[in-house]
């Protein structure tokens, strides 16, 4: 029988090679918690984006040598995932101003590349908070029981 709260922690090198390991772990955690297939897939995309951003941007000044910490907190009605690094931070407001949503009439040949990670994370998860002190920490929550989801327009908090 599952306890009301479980906690799993991973610490991996900031390397793209470990994204698949993190995704596999996430699948197991979400499956054990009783999440739907769609919730598992949404969370895998969101976590992949957050980890890939850390791999690409956090340690670029340090020859991509660094560590990414991933925490899964499994609660009765939700799963909270925290991804953190100690690398370079970024200006959230500037980054956000450059991301979607895209205009459906926009010519696909002129769509800007990159910058979709935060947009995808916000779109796929129920709650998202970005902390920018001492690196970047992204906290995201996926509710397993959907009645818990807050119905608000802006779900990303910055602190």
UniProtKB/Swiss-Prot annotation:
Enzyme superclass (EC): transferase
Catalytic reaction(s) noted: L-seryl-[protein] + ATP = O-phospho-L-seryl-[protein] + ADP + H(+); L-threonyl-[protein] + ATP = O-phospho-L-threonyl-[protein] + ADP + H(+)
MF annotations from Gene Ontology: ATP binding; protein serine kinase activity; protein serine/threonine kinase activity; sigma factor antagonist activity
A UniProt-annotated Pfam family: HATPase_c_2
Keyword DNA damage: no
Ranges annotated as spanning the membrane: none
Organism: Staphylococcus aureus (strain MSSA476)
Function, in words: Negative regulator of sigma-B activity. Phosphorylates and inactivates its specific antagonist protein, RsbV. Upon phosphorylation of RsbV, RsbW is released and binds to sigma-B, thereby blocking its ability to form an RNA polymerase holoenzyme (E-sigma-B).
Protein name per UniProt: Serine-protein kinase RsbW
Keyword line: ATP-binding, Kinase, Nucleotide-binding, Serine/threonine-protein kinase, Transferase
The protein's Enzyme Commission number: 2.7.11.1
KW Methyltransferase (keyword) present: no
Family in the record: Belongs to the anti-sigma-factor family.
NCBIfam families noted in UniProt: PRK04069.1, rsbW_low_gc
